[in-house]
C-alpha cells in the first residue's frame, strides 16, 4: 500500500507561526505567518489540493511586524489573530490584534502560479487586544466551538479574557487574572479546553502547567515541575475531558489526567532536542503529533490512553455469526508506538497542526520557512477505521 509523498512549500522568509483555518470544514487550508526584521511580513494562505497533491497559495501583507503566533476564528473563515513584535523607540513590544482577510480569499480563490506579478493584498485591522500595561503577548486562543466572540490573550504574567463586539471591531476586556509567585513569571503558551462547556483554559509558565476557570478567573489545578525545563506547548484531548498533553525543553512529551496531577499518565522521550509543539488529532485522539528543534516530526499512536484503548470494538449484537466474532479486534489494550518519524525538515520545527477538514492530513513548519504537508500512513488509517 503506497503512501503519498509529502508535499513541500517554501516561504522566502523565516517562519514559526502556523494554524489551520479552523472554521473551514470542506477545504484543506493552513495559514502561515513569517518572521522578517528587514521586509514586510506576510501571511501565506496555503490551499492543499488533495486530488492532485499540489499547493495553491495567496499572500497577505502583515506590515505590523514579525509574527510569533497565529490563530484562526472557529466561526468566521475570514478572521484571525496574530501576536507580533513591533519596535518603537528602539524598544521591542509584543502586541496582539484581530484581522480580517479580503472576502475573496476566505474560500481560497488563489493566484495563478503563472502570474508572478500578482500583488499581495493587505489585512484589514479589526481591533487591537490592547492590554496597556499588562506586558508582552505570547499567544491568543479562541473559545473552541464558539461564535468567535471570546478570546483569551496571555501577556507576561496576565491572562486576559476578551469579548469581541459585533463584527469584531472592538475588544472589551471582560475579566483577567495574574500569576502570583516569586520572580518574573511569564506565560509561554495556553489552550482552551473544548470540554466543561468551554469554561477551562490551561496555561504554561516556566516549568508549570495551570488550569483556570474562565467564569471566576481562578486557578483550578496546578502541575508544578511538569517538565524539567521550560514548557513550550500543550493541547487537550478532544475526546477525554480530563486529559492533556504537554511538551518542553527537556525533550519530553507528557500526558496528564488533571484529576490527579502528581505524576503524568505517560511520558514520551522520542525527540533529542526541545519539543516545541504537540497536537492531538481532532477525531482520533490516539494520534499525537510533535515537532522539535531536532528537525523531526513524530506521529505517535497513544492508543492505551485514548478514548478507544481496545481499538474499534464491535458490539455482540452487531455480529450475525458468533463463529466470526473471534476475528474481531481483541479486547486486550493495544500497544502505544511511534507510527512514523518525518525528516523532511532541515531546521527547527516550531509548529505542527492537523487540517481542520481532513483528519488524516497534517502540516509542519520549520524556521527556514519550509512547510511540509503529510498524511497518516494508509495502513494505520484503515486499521483505525475498519
UniProtKB/Swiss-Prot annotation:
Primary location: Golgi
Compartments reported by the entry: Golgi apparatus, trans-Golgi network
Expression tissues: Ubiquitous. Highly expressed in brain, adipose tissue, spleen and kidney (at protein level).
GO (cellular component) term, any one: GARP complex
Keyword set includes Repeat: yes
Keywords: Acetylation, Golgi apparatus, Phosphoprotein, Repeat, WD repeat
Pfam families in the cross-refs: Beta-prop_EIPR1, WD40
Transferase is among the record's keywords: no
WD repeat ranges, renumbered to this chain: 132-172, 182-222, 226-266, 270-310, 344-384
GO biological process, one term: regulation of insulin secretion
Residues found modified as Phosphoserine: 320
Renumbered residue ranges of the record's region Disordered: 312-332
Sequence positions bearing N-acetylmethionine: 1
Biased composition (Basic and acidic residues): 322-332
Database matches in SUPFAM superfamilies: WD40 repeat-like
Superkingdom: Eukaryota
Cystine residue pairs: none
Described function: Acts as a component of endosomal retrieval machinery that is involved in protein transport from early endosomes to either recycling endosomes or the trans-Golgi network. Mediates the recruitment of Golgi-associated retrograde protein (GARP) complex to the trans-Golgi network and controls early endosome-to-Golgi transport of internalized protein. Promotes the recycling of internalized transferrin receptor (TFRC) to the plasma membrane through interaction with endosome-associated recycling protein (EARP) complex.
Assembly behavior: Interacts with two multisubunit tethering complexes: EARP composed of VPS50, VPS51, VPS52 and VPS53 subunits and GARP complex composed of VPS51, VPS52, VPS53 and VPS54 subunits. Interacts with SNAP29.
Family membership noted in the UniProt record: Belongs to the WD repeat EIPR1 family.
UniProt-recorded name of the protein: EARP and GARP complex-interacting protein 1
Gene: Eipr1
Amino acid at each position: 500500500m503506497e503512501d503519498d509523498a509529502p508535499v513541500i512549500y517554501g516561504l522566502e522568509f523565516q517562519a514559526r507561526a502556523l494554524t489551520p483555518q479552523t472554521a473551514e470544514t470542506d477545504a484543506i487550508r493552513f495559514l502561515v505567518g513569517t518572521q522578517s526584521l528587514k521586509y514586510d511580513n506576510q501571511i501565506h494562505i496555503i490551499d492543499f489540493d488533495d486530488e492532485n497533491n499540489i499547493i495553491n497559495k495567496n499572500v497577505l501583507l502583515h506590515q505590523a511586524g514579525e509574527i510569533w503566533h497565529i490563530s484562526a476564528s472557529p466561526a468566521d473563515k475570514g478572521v484571525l489573530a496574530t501576536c507580533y513584535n513591533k519596535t518603537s523607540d528602539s524598544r521591542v513590544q509584543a502586541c496582539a490584534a484581530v484581522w480580517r482577510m479580503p472576502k475573496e480569499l476566505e474560500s481560497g480563490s488563489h493566484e495563478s502560479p503563472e502570474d508572478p506579478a500578482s500583488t499581495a493584498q493587505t489585512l484589514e485591522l479589526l481591533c487591537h487586544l490592547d492590554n496597556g500595561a499588562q506586558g508582552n503577548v505570547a499567544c491568543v486562543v479562541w473559545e473552541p466551538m464558539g461564535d468567535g466572540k471570546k478570546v483569551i490573550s496571555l501577556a507576561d504574567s496576565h491572562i486576559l479574557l476578551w469579548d469581541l463586539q459585533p463584527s469584531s471591531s472592538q475588544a472589551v476586556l471582560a475579566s483577567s487574572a495574574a500569576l502570583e509567585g516569586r520572580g518574573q513569571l511569564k506565560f509561554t503558551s495556553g489552550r482552551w479546553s473544548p470540554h466543561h462547556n468551554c469554561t477551562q483554559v490551561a496555561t504554561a509558565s516556566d516549568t508549570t502547567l495551570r488550569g483556570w476557570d474562565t467564569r471566576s478567573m481562578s486557578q483550578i489545578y496546578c502541575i508544578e515541575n511538569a517538565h524539567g525545563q521550560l514548557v513550550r506547548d500543550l493541547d487537550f484531548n478532544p475526546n477525554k475531558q480530563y486529559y492533556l498533553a504537554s511538551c518542553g525543553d527537556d525533550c519530553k512529551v507528557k500526558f496528564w489526567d488533571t484529576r490527579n496531577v502528581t505524576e503524568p499518565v505517560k511520558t514520551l522521550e522520542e525527540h533529542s532536542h526541545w519539543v516545541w509543539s504537540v497536537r492531538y488529532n481532532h477525531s482520533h485522539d490516539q494520534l499525537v503529533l510533535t515537532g522539535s528543534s531536532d528537525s523531526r516530526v513524530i506521529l505517535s499512536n497513544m492508543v492505551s490512553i485514548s478514548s478507544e484503548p481496545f481499538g474499534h470494538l464491535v458490539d455482540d449484537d452487531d455480529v450475525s455469526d458468533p463463529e466470526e466474532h473471534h476475528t474481531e479486534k481483541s479486547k486486550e489494550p493495544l500497544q502505544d508506538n511511534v507510527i512514523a518519524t518525518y525528516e523532511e525538515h532541515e531546521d527547527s520545527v516550531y509548529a505542527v497542526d492537523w487540517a481542520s477538514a481532513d483528519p488524516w492530513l497534517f502540516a509542519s513548519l520549520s524556521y527556514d520557512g519550509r512547510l511540509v504537508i503529510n498524511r497518516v500512513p494508509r495502513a494505520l488509517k484503515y486499521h483505525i477505521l475498519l
